[in-house]
Amino acid sequence: SGFALWLSFRGSEMCIRDRPIVTEVLDVKDLDLICKYADMLQIGARNCKNYALLKEAGKSKKPVLLKRGMSTSLNEFLLCAEYLLAEGNMAVALCERGIRTFETATRNTFDINAIPVLKEKTHLPIIADPAHGTGYWQYVSPIAYAAIAAGADGLAIEVHDKPEIALSDGGQSLKPKKFNIMVEKSRIIANSIAFE
């Protein structure tokens, strides 16, 4: 298929650059193909409660980045992760990426509370996705800083040198220069905070 050709090409290109590949799995039927090329599987917000996909991804033993569903409580989110863990896959990271609220100024509302609450309830690493959490590039860095200060173990950031022509998510992508500044400031914040 065209997807397989694209993924094999992009996978080869990233391997040449010695970069790991994280890609989203949308359906159980695509799992074997994606596992051939990806270093980590992403299960997006819309599939957070796709239990068949969670079980099969758990069996794959590939690391999984599980994104929180837009209307998923934190307890429900942790129970979704249990489907992966129950299959013996201990390489699971949870990703806060914003929830649906009544607010319309941003695409989603980044739930900063989720980070310390999840850190208290689970041993799994917590990744923050401020790009999807806001939907606008100008809010990505401030929310990233807040997430690091709240205890996030990592960030998922979209970067594009020409976001205006990006095939998707251009409006929430940082240009490389802004990304580099954000990384440096995030390191300063992370190094200045001592977590228990």
Regions found by a protein language model. Give the residues of each.
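Single conserved hydrophobic/aromatic residue that forms the stacking wall/gate
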Residues: 1-11, 16
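Hydrophobic faces of well-ordered beta-strands that scaffold small-molecule active sites
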Residues: 21-23, 41-43, 64, 92-96, ...
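Active-site beta-loop-alpha junctions enriched in small/polar residues
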Residues: 26-28, 46, 69-71, 97-101, ...
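Conserved anion-binding
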Residues: 46-113
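Catalytic cores of alpha/beta
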Residues: 29-35, 76-80, 136-149
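Glycine-rich phosphate-binding active-site loops on the catalytic face of alpha/beta enzymes
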Residues: 45-49, 150-172
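C-terminal helical cap(s) of enzyme catalytic domains, especially alpha/beta-barrels
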Residues: 162-195
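Charged helix-capping and loop-helix junction motifs
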Residues: 107-113, 138-145, 172-176
